[in-house]
């Protein structure tokens, strides 16, 4: 009986998608670092490629990027999208083992914003009080059995 490699039911990416996504991320980061893209905005902006998610057929690479500094993320994404075919050609030699070179799609990486929102929420006095109260209760529960064992 053949084993099913469908990961849609589990909600996760396959090992192959993760591996290829990381290879594409590394190759894309090298192209950006070397400054091979002739665009004023891209040349003067440091761009972080935080993740690349591959489609199940490995034909689409969704690249999550964060421009560092004061650059507008949407403008950077638009500039990268306009050079997507050029980027695809520059990344190709690093990914020669792939049967098909993926189409690049660029999206803003909002995970840093989400982390800062969560951090801000955790710093509220009410939340800090509740967290310290939970720690006190946990510590007290751990102490009681040890005293009873002696």
UniProtKB/Swiss-Prot annotation:
The name on file for this protein is Ribosome-binding factor A
Stretches the record annotates as Disordered: 131-150
Q: Name one GO molecular function term.
A: ribosomal small subunit binding
InterPro entries for this protein? KH_dom-like_a/b, RbfA, RbfA_dom_sf, Ribosome-bd_factorA_CS
Major localisation: cytoplasm
One Gene Ontology term from the biological process aspect of the record: maturation of SSU-rRNA
What does the record give as the function of this protein? One of several proteins that assist in the late maturation steps of the functional core of the 30S ribosomal subunit. Associates with free 30S ribosomal subunits (but not with 30S subunits that are part of 70S ribosomes or polysomes). Required for efficient processing of 16S rRNA. May interact with the 5'-terminal helix region of 16S rRNA.
Where it sits in the cell: the answer is: Cytoplasm
The source organism is Brucella melitensis biotype 2 (strain ATCC 23457)
Q: Which family does it belong to?
A: Belongs to the RbfA family.
Q: GO CC terms for this protein?
A: cytosol
How does this polypeptide assemble, per the annotation? Monomer. Binds 30S ribosomal subunits, but not 50S ribosomal subunits or 70S ribosomes.
PANTHER family, sorted = RIBOSOME-BINDING FACTOR A, CHLOROPLASTIC-RELATED
Q: Which NCBIfam families match?
A: PRK00521.2-5, rbfA
Q: Which UniProt keywords apply?
A: Cytoplasm, Ribosome biogenesis
């Amino acid at each position: 009986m053949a084993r099913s490699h469908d990961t849609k039911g589990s909600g996760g990416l396959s090992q192959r998608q993760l591996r290829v996504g990381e290879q594409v991320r590394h190759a894309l980061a090298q192209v950006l670092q070397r400054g091979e893209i002739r665009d004023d905005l891209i040349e003067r902006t440091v761009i972080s490629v935080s993740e690349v998610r591959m489609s199940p057929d490995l034909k689409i690479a969704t690249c999550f990027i964060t421009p560092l500094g004061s650059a507008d993320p949407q403008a950077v994404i638009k500039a990268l999208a306009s050079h997507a075919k050029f980027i695809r050609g520059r990344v190709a030699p690093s990914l020669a083992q792939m049967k098909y070179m993926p189409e690049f799609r660029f999206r803003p990486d909002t995970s840093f914003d989400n982390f800062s929102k969560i951090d801000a929420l955790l710093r509220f006095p009410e939340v800090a009080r509740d967290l310290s109260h939970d720690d006190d209760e946990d510590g007290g529960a751990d102490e009681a059995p040890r005293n009873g064992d002696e």
